[in-house]
Structure formats: structure tokens, C-alpha cells
Amino acid sequence: MTTNVSIPQYRTDIYSTQSILDPYPHYATLRTLGPVVWLPHQQVFAISRYADCKAVLLDDETFVSGDGVALNPVANRLGRGTTLNSDGDEHATKRSVLAHRLTPKAVRKMTSAVQEKAEGIVDAALSKQSVDGVDDLATALPMSIVPDLVGWPEDGREDLLRWAGATFDSLGPVNRHSVAAVKGAAEMLAFSRRVVRERSVIPGSMGDDVLKAADENKIAKSSCPALMIDYLGPSLDTTIGAISGALDLFARHPQQWQAIRQNPDLIPNAVNEVVRYESPIRAFSRRAVRDVEIDGSRVPKGARVLVIYASANRDEREWDNPDAFDITRDAARQLGFGSGVHGCAGQGLARLETQTMLRVLARRVERFVPAGTPKRAVNN
């Protein structure tokens, strides 16, 4: 593809292992270079500034998801049939199948159950000499809630974390991480097809709603396996990322943890700040269906753009001192859960789980003392 000569290029691979582990210097360079930057390694236009990212996310008629939101064709093919990879009426219809499960009112009804789960998980963790924040807390809570909510059968849960991580990892460009992840993503889809074929979902669950919608011809039966995964994978990974990020940040900023302990009303905004500072979802792509200008830079019809949420959330044009973690800042407009019609459908539950975990910990844990150097996951 030929690029507009006026658009700058950034030749560093932002999906190398080192870049994945420390992406923010690269994002800062992209924002400095311009509103649109060509990435020759990925053959995409990077959108890295807050205002431009939000504008692209809100313009779902120009920047479509139906051709896939990944940076490689295999993942885009595997993602067919999901709400993530659909547009317009198709997207609205598929999202409506579970809409009643995801309203603020529906999520509020889960508060007591989530609270009870969190209390038990913290009890178990604090009985140990040392706690693995990721396994014992961040993973334990969503794993105790989401599979039952979705209706995933018990015999398929031992692989869920590996599959969910692989589903996200497969969304990157063709590199060793996405190539290794495709197997896990394909396994998850194959298992979901079996669940649909055998109708082995838990009665009264989200998965049950999906199958009933197909029975009533509201959606195609062929889309059911992908829709089962649609909520399951992201609901696990985003919440695990948010809680893990919170634990790490509060270990490094003990004064802010003390502020939360003294005033738990700060917790909802603290969760927004955690998601702003360490976005669980770093980026998704879109396809431009017409020639379009982004802040004076021309993106041609047919081009793929990479909307970098994590960069938008550190944009100095939008945030004062963006590289500082500050739970008192108004971070409600962060883009860590996306925006527009494709905003994360499960963000209400992710917020509830993360807030509840922090509330329980704030009552019972004076401080977090790292037992060693945190090992960061490498995920596209």
C-alpha cells in the first residue's frame, strides 16, 4: 500500500517483546510525530492521541469493525460472528441478545454475590504466608463469577485462562506471540462449538440466552459459538488486568492506598485511574470505508487504522501530568474500555468486581509489600 507522503512513519516495531513490556515511550513518540503515523512493520496507520482515538471510535460508519479488529487475517477470520467484529444492524442485534444482562440495574443486582465471593477469596489469600496477587486475587474473583454467568460447562474451565489470554494475544500482528496464540484461540472456538452442539450450557445463563435467540431465529445458529466467547474471554482478561494493575500500582504508591483506606469513596475513581494508567485493552484496529481526514492527515479508503487506547490515556494534550498515577484525578473519560457502540459490554461487571475487591482489601490490608519483582505478561 502506498502511503500519504505527508504522514510520518515510525519504523520501530511496537509489537516486539520489549515494546510490549514497555510501550509508553513508543506511544509518546507516536503522539509527537503526528495525529496519524504509518507503522511499516504492521502496515497500518496508528492513531495515538486522545481526541483522534475517541473520534474514530465514535465514527463507526467510517471506521468499521466488520472486517475484523485484529492485525492479522487469521484472528479476524476466527472472530467472525462476534459483536466485536460486526457493524450496524448486525452488531445491534447480536448485542441485544445479552443487553438485559449488562444494564447497570442488572449489574447492581449482582453486588451481594460479588461481595460474598470477594470476601471468601480474600479470606483464603490472607491465610497464606505470601499472596500471589494475580492468581490468588485478580484471577480468583472473575473466575468464580464469569464462567457461571456465561454458563460455561464445568468440564471446559481448566483451560479458560489459557484460552482467554490466547484470544487476546492472537489479535496482534503476525509475530511469534500471535502465531503461538492462534492454537489456543482455535481450541476455545472448537470447544464452544461443541457446547452449542450439545447444548451443555448452564440453564438460565447468558449462554442459554444465546441458544434461545438462535432457536427464535433472532440470530444465526452459526454465530452462537463466537457469541459464547464474545463475553467470556474479555470479561476474564480485562478484570484480571484491572485488578492486577491496581495491586501493582498501590504497592508502588502506598500513600494512595492509605488514602483509599481512609476514604473508600475514592475507589470508583481510583478504578478509572487504574484503567487509564494501565489500560487492560491497549489497542484495536478498524477499517476505513472511505477516504477520511484525521486532524488534517488523510487516511485512504480501505486502510486499516490502529486505535491505541493506552496511548490516548497517556496523552499530554488531554491529561495533566499523564504519566503520574493519581487516584484523585477525574479519570472517568478514560478510553481503557473503549467508547461508542463497541465500548466494552462487560465493563459494568469489570468495574463492580474491581471496586469490590479493592473495598474488601482496603478494610483488611494495611499495605502491599512486593515479595519480588513483578513478572509482566507478554501479550499482544
For each feature predicted by the language model, list its residue ranges:
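Cytochrome P450
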Residues: 1-380
